[in-house]
Amino acid sequence: MIVTGGSKGIGLAIAEEFAKEGAAVSICARGQENLDKARELIETAGGTVHAKTCDVSDPGALQEYIESAVAALDGLNILVNNPSGFGRTDDEQGWQVGLDIDLMALVRGSWAAVPHIEKAGGGALIHTSSISGLTSSLRTPPYGAVKAAVIQYTKTQALQLANKNIRVNCIAPGSIEFPGGTWDDAKKNNPTLYASIQNSIPFGRLGEPNEVAKLAVFLGSDAASWITGETIAVDGGQML
């Protein structure tokens, strides 16, 4: 199985959880240092791992990565599309980052992976969206819009790929905290914002990456064989 954006945070947690279940895993990310650290963690979890640097906004590089991962894994049955450029600013650059990384990298990754998953007899695509795609996103308009597009595309893909025995589902995490992540930074540099988010969650805390990862493993498993086209929020009731 492949996880794009798999060197830290939610992506790394997903790769680790799949490795614990015995899956051979491939991850990609832009930075070699984080990728090397992630490889060590996944191997410690007992997994076989292929890791390669890749700028997923580059169509050729993404295609090359998918092909190298399939060769290293000797096939493919699960793709987790987890890249995020987190386009924050409501300007040309913010929108372009969101479109190139959050949306088109997911689309192109799917195009590259689907023939291999079909060849394996079927499997699953799992896309990472966000609760920002389910509601208004005043602070980050591009991010909310592209994450909403991911949710819609999930439904379309589910219909397109059912006859290939490929299920397509989407995870919409809420505010998830991990070292080096957005909310870790906010906790240190914008405690007022961090506290407001923390107080908006009924459980009084932010989520952890492994709480998202466990759902991804379920959606990739035979236990979810009759689930497709769904978007599931993992937010501790943040949107209630």
Regions found by a protein language model. Name each.
Residues S7-G9:
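Conserved glycine-rich cofactor-binding loop
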Residues S110, V146, T154:
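Active-site helix of classical SDR
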Residues P115, L159-Q160, S225:
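Alpha-helical segment proximal to the catalytic Tyr-Lys
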Residues S130:
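Residue(s) in the substrate-gating loop at a strand-loop-helix junction
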Residues A162, R167, I227-G229:
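Short, small/polar-rich loop/turn modules that mediate ligand/substrate recognition or access, typified
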Residues N163, S175-S200:
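A glycine/serine/threonine-rich, flexible loop-to-helix segment
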Residues R205-V234, M239:
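C-terminal substrate-recognition "lid" of short-chain dehydrogenase/reductases
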